[in-house]
Structures are given as structure tokens and as C-alpha cells.
Amino acid sequence: MAEKVNVCIVGSGNWGSAIAKIVGANAAALPEFEERVTMFVYEEMIDGKKLTEIINETHENVKYLKGHKLPTNVVAVPDLVEAAKNADILIFVVPHQFIPNFCKQLLGKIKPNAIAISLIKGFDKAEGGGIDLISHIITRHLKIPCAVLMGANLANEVAEGNFCETTIGCTDKKYGKVLRDLFQANHFRVVVVEDADAVEVCGALKNIVACGAGFVDGLKLGDNTKAAVIRLGLMEMIRFVDVFYPGSKLSTFFESCGVADLITTCYGGRNRRVSEAFVTSGKTIEDLEKEMLNGQKLQGPPTAEEVNYMLKNKGLEDKFPLFTAIHKICTNQLKPKDLIDCIRNHPEHMQTL
């Protein structure tokens, strides 16, 4: 790595802007980092003015993180290659569907000894069906190592400076320290583990469970039912990792990326909120995304679809009744009120005494 570590944030949505507050402050304060942090911003017009100009002049992302000032050393750049070309650390924080295209644009245009870290909670569709981990796509396309950061980190609360924890999954110990230094703050405590695949899978699967929690809220079934859905969701997450990513540690599920992220997403996240409105309003998920998320996309429904493809291929849908039911509700194959019937006889309840 260079004497001073250059950092680029690829993405500037709600979460990207919140993390820019921490990364920018650390880059300015710590001697190992270059002070200037570039942030790739998809250019759009806001009231007749370019979003990058607004961010660089006012140090506020008025579209995705209104009311929060970004550090002055975070510089918005509308050209992806220009933002990333000098980076030693690339922080990817964009909707997962953009990653293959971004990697194509960056191939051969970044430092060969750079490292990446993905903050993206979702899977991509693998060729031939199934799922591909975002960190694997980044490594495969860009030929650089890619760690992951996942946790109970609702963007607005992180931006407010409220205390929380996060988990970095990094298979190569030599990168663990520099990544922890870049993200650790008084209010944002980082634990580094080597079990990177499990950390990343947790970050995606919990969005499916959060949709289930939202359906329960929309149906007004109460806290006991919601707790049951969360617990069964955790058990299905553990089982899914066991089947498709064997060798992971059970302890990883008790880090912030696991049970903590699951709880916070099932009570406060956008997947829960939109899923509740899906039940109460009768509108489509697409319409609710436009209405409630400023055009941003939910991760839960597409992740449920990708996971269902994998379960179907292995004949395992009946072993994952919660994931299966949530997918079917999101695709209008089942009514939300059918959710509980689907999990009444969950494998978790079929113990032999």
C-alpha cells in the first residue's frame, strides 16, 4: 500500500453518505490516511443544480442524507473511474445490482494492489441461476481482495452519532487493522472476524426476514408472533449458511452482523416498513418503493427470489418455510395472511421427544 492510504467511497446514497461521515473524519484525523476522500456520486439534478456541486459546496447530500453535514475533506466526484483511480481502499456501498457494471468500468483502471470492502447487503444472481456474493464478484472482476462490513447499522442513526456496533469480515488478517482504523469511531465500534462469507450472507438474508416482520406488523399480529418470525428467520439463516457456505462459525451469528442486525432491521429498517405498507395499503412493492424510498430499491424481495431459486434447485423449499413463504407473498403467489399457516409446522417445531 502507498505511504498514505487513499480512500474512495463508491456510492453516495443514505448509507454511503452516513459512512462518509465516519470515514472522512478518520481520514482527516489519522496519519496513515490521505486526508482527501473521494466519493463517487451518480450525477443528478436537484432543483436545477448538480448534486455533486451541492455536496461539494454545502457538504450535505440533500437528496439522501438531508440535515447532516459531511466532512469537508469528502469530495463528490461524478466520474467513477476518476473517483477510484488513486484509491488504495475502495468502499463499495451501492445497490447490489450495479456492481457487475461498475466492476467492468473499473477493470484495469485501479491500483493493482488496492483492496476493497463491500458494505452492500444483498446478493447478485449467479450465471445459470442462484446467488453470487458481492465480495466474490468484486474479487473475481477486479482481481483484488474484498472484505465485508455488516451490522446493526441503520444509516440515519449512524449519521446521528448514536452508539452501535458493526462486524468486518476479512479473511486476510493483514488488512484487518487498516480497515478497523478506517471505520472505528467512538460511536461506531468494529469487531473484525475471519468468517467473511457468513458475515456477508447474514447481511443479505436478514432483509428477507425483515419483510416477514413487516407483514406481521401490517397484519397487526403482535410482538409474540413477530418474535417467532425473527427466531425462525435466524434459524433459517444459520441453516442456509450451513448448506451453501459450510465451515462457517456459529459464533459469527452472534456478532452485530447476525442477530443484532436481524433485530434492528425487523424493527426499524426499510424492508420492514415497506412490507407493512404492502399489507395495509394493497399497493405493489414497486409503487411503494417510489412513494416511500425516494426511488431507492428494497433488497428483501429480490434476495428472497434469488434464495428461493437456490432452495428450489436443491429441493429444500420445505426446509425453509419462512423464506419460501416470504418470497411467495412478495410475488403475489400467497396472501400476507397465509404467512402464519406456512410456518405453523416449521421443522423447528417438529422435534422428536
UniProtKB/Swiss-Prot annotation:
Indicate which residues the UniProt annotation says bind substrate. K121, R270, N271
Per its record, how is this protein called by name?
Glycerol-3-phosphate dehydrogenase [NAD(+)], cytoplasmic
TM spans, by residue? none
Source organism of the structure = Drosophila virilis
- What is known about its subunit structure? Homodimer.
InterPro entries in the record, alphabetically?
6-PGluconate_DH-like_C_sf, 6PGD_dom2, G3P_DH_NAD-dep, G3P_DH_NAD-dep_C, G3P_DH_NAD-dep_euk, G3P_DH_NAD-dep_N, NAD(P)-bd_dom_sf
Task: Respond yes or no to whether keyword Mitochondrion is given for this record.
Answer: no
This protein's gene is called: Gpdh1
Grouped into one coarse class, the protein's main location is cytoplasm
Subcellular localization is given as: Cytoplasm
Q: EC number(s) in its UniProt entry?
A: 1.1.1.8
